[in-house]
Regions:
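N-terminal active-site beta-alpha-beta segment that forms phosphate/nucleotide-binding
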Residues: 54-116, 347-360, 365-367, 371-377, ...
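Well-ordered mid-protein domain cores that form the structural environment of catalytic cofactors
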Residues: 82-163, 183-189
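Conserved, well-structured core segments that form the ligand-binding/active-site neighborhood
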Residues: 132-321, 328, 348-361
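C-terminal catalytic subdomain
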Residues: 340, 344-447
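A short, acidic, amphipathic alpha-helical segment used as a generic capping/interface helix at domain edges
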Residues: 52-55, 299-300, 304-316, 349-357, ...
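Extended hydrophobic packing segments that form well-structured cores
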Residues: 1-31, 36, 44, 48-49, ...
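N-terminal glycine-/serine-/threonine-rich phosphate-binding loop
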Residues: 32-62, 340-341, 347-348, 471
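Short helix/loop capping segments that flank catalytic or ligand/cofactor-binding pockets
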Residues: 14, 78-79, 207, 213-217, ...
Length: 514
């Protein structure tokens, strides 16, 4: 059969055996039905007025309260007119105004964590013209700055040693509200440093997305606050080899140490703030449409949202495990332009596929992936990546985990920090999160082929094999690794559509068990 796979800004055609199994999210197996557009406002309002495990906003918020509404950045969630963020913010504002909260006491805060701080065009795209114009010109929209210590609160360490530093405005508000997508010291001694605006607010609201995520199963809930409004030292408690290379991390589930740390850090933030986050998370489909909406306390709301999201995300598909997994990388996806050409980002994307689909892969599985791999690092977005790539080839760095000892050195390099704060770049420590993930592909495959690379030496420097075409790569894999009749899984559009976590057909029902 002939199939097209993403390659650069176009596609590369592959001739694969007719026995190849093809999976396209939302098409091969249909998503659960989404909420009709005309019912979204009412469904969102009903969720917000009937929160799980805590009182509604009309009882939590009062005249004179300060409120921070925490919003995911542009990486996930959709920007269509009916996107969850747009609708949830408007409904929440109506509830706050009805409770006596004044507009001047409300801040919209983007929870970008170590991602590039949300740009003005991105703010406009995410919020829409009406919301943007209501709040931007009065300086009531901001993006979390994890290096502005005037806006951070050091909460110390969890009992398990994790450092928690959070956004000061969220900490100080009367009611913190998290709008998400179900996408001091804690019990593990993790250091917690958080955003001060959130810490100081009377009401902190998290708007999120319950969306399949290789890091801990789902976005949203406590993952949102633990990664989005904290500091690199806090994120270094979980986005590291010691956590990501454990057996409980692959395949993806909500039962991993990483997920436990998200939850523990989130609860610790609530303990120090003196009140819980008010969450409003939407379960999203392949096209970022709302399947269901849940509000309330993250601890009680998360499991209920996951139960619904499991039906869309953990897909029983394979009758037997696969020898070969085939897909393609565009240049621009997920973390931005250059994701499919920057070698460190390429390796992270390859590994994310392993984390999601390990349940259907044989132990000696081979990956074949198209990438233009032309040397485009997008240095403005990932200014540290070229230096990391060069260092990886020197000074006894045999595998990517050997680079971990340089994390603090890069995380404190002033020029990289300035580019994160003021020039739209990722934080330098994000590169170490990416490398922690990137090694997982090597850990779980016999070989990985990049086909169509314009600069194949870059791919080979990351331990990847290179061939000109899918057909050449498959022939080599059949000769050396998988035999003459491999079971092949093809994943067209895998980086263009909302991802799933593939499972065996005879697996136990429910996420983490299929």
């Amino acid at each position: 059969m002939k199939l097209d796979f993403e390659y650069g800004n176009g596609v590369m055609t592959a001739q694969l055996p007719d026995s190849t199994k093809v999976f396209v999210p939302g098409q091969t197996v249909s998503d659960p039905p989404h909420i009709p557009e005309e019912q979204l406002v009412e469904a969102t309002r009903n969720s917000i007025r009937n929160p799980i495990g805590m009182p509604p906003l009309c009882q939590l918020a009062h005249a004179g309260n300060t409120v921070v509404i925490v919003i995911p950045d542009i990486v996930k969630g959709g920007c269509q007119p009916t996107a969850h963020r747009k609708i949830a913010i408007r409904v929440i504002l109506d509830e706050l105004y009805a409770a006596g909260v004044e507009k001047k006491d409300i801040l919209l805060l983007f929870s970008n964590g170590l991602h590039p701080r949300t740009s003005v065009p991105e703010m406009r795209k995410i919020l829409g013209e009406e919301l943007f114009n209501e709040f931007y010109h009065t300086h009531q929209i901001d993006s979390h700055d994890s290096e502005n210590y005037d806006d951070l609160v050091d909460l110390g360490y969890t009992t398990h040693g994790d450092h928690v530093i959070m956004n000061k405005r969220v900490f100080a508000c009367d009611l913190p509200i998290l709008i998400g997508h179900t996408q001091g010291y804690t019990d593990h001694g993790d250091h917690v440093i958080m955003n001060k605006y959130v810490y100081d607010a009377d009401v902190a609201i998290l708007i999120g997305h319950t969306q399949g995520n290789p890091y801990g199963g789902y976005s949203g809930g406590y993952k949102h606050c633990a990664t989005g409004i904290t500091h690199w030292r806090c994120i270094a408690a979980h986005h590291v080899p010691e956590v990501m290379h454990r057996k409980d991390f692959v395949p993806v589930s909500t039962h991993s140490m990483m997920r436990n740390k998200f939850d523990e850090i989130g609860r610790y933030m609530e303990e120090k703030m003196g009140h819980p986050f008010f969450c409003c998370d939407a379960v999203l489909d392949t096209y970022s449409r709302q399947i269901a909406i849940y509000s309330g306390c993250a601890e009680k709301m998360q499991p209920i949202a996951w139960e619904v999201a499991d039906k869309r995300t953990y897909v029983p598909f394979a009758e037997e495990k696969f020898d070969v997994m085939v897909f393609g990388m565009p240049i621009d996806f997920h973390y931005g332009n250059g994701m499919g050409t920057n070698p460190i980002q390429m390796m992270q994307a390859l590994s994310a596929q392993v984390i999601r689909h390990k349940r259907v892969m044989k132990e000696n599985c081979v990956i074949i992936c198209s990438s233009i791999c032309d040397g485009y690092f997008h240095d403005e977005r990932w200014p540290y990546a070229r230096e990391l790539f060069d260092l990886f080839g020197h000074d006894y760095h045999q595998t990517l985990p050997d680079m971990a000892s340089l994390g603090e050195y890069f995380a404190t390099k002033e020029e990289y920090i300035r580019k994160y704060r003021f020039a739209g770049a990722f934080h330098p420590y994000h590169g170490f999160s990416m490398m922690s993930c990137a090694h997982i592909a090597e850990m779980n495959t016999s070989a990985i082929y990049i086909v169509g690379a314009r600069e194949p030496g870059i791919a080979r420097a990351m331990g990847l094999k290179t061939r000109a075409t899918f057909e050449e790569a498959l022939a080599d894999a059949m000769k050396k690794y998988v035999g003459p009749s491999p079971n092949i899984l093809a994943l067209p559009q895998t980086f263009k559509l909302g991802a799933v976590h593939l499972c065996m057909k005879d697996g136990a029902a429910g996420q983490g068990h299929c």
